[in-house]
Swiss-Prot record:
Gene: petJ
Role description: Functions as an electron carrier between membrane-bound cytochrome b6-f and photosystem I in oxygenic photosynthesis.
Name by which UniProt lists this protein: Cytochrome c6
Location in the cell: Plastid, Chloroplast thylakoid lumen
Positions that bind heme c: 10, 13-14, 56
Biological process per Gene Ontology, one example term: photosynthesis
Length: 87
């Protein structure tokens, strides 16, 4: 599932929804609204996963289509839930 994809591929930089590379660019709903083109939507999150931005690598061609969809859904859900207050 998405949690496993995240743990295996994203958590090095985004541990617990944070960001160890770029302060403030965390995975809370508020930060996603501010920093992602398109804001807090699954489409915007999926675009970021596929294409990367700045120090974040593109994952298209690395992750399978199913993994991209799963991790997108996971981040979307966590951003409005468990990670809502990450800063």
């Amino acid at each position: 599932g998405g949690a496993d994809v995240f743990a295996d591929n994203c958590s090095t930089c985004h541990v617990n929804g944070g960001n160890v590379i770029s302060a403030g660019k965390v995975l809370s709903k508020t930060a996603i609204e501010e920093y992602l083109d398109g804001g807090y939507t699954k489409e915007a999150i999926e675009y970021q996963v596929r294409n990367g931005k700045g120090p974040m690598p593109a994952w298209e061609g690395v992750l399978s289509e199913d993994e991209i969809v799963a991790v997108t859904d996971y981040v979307y859900t966590q951003a409005g839930g468990a990670w809502a207050n990450v800063s």
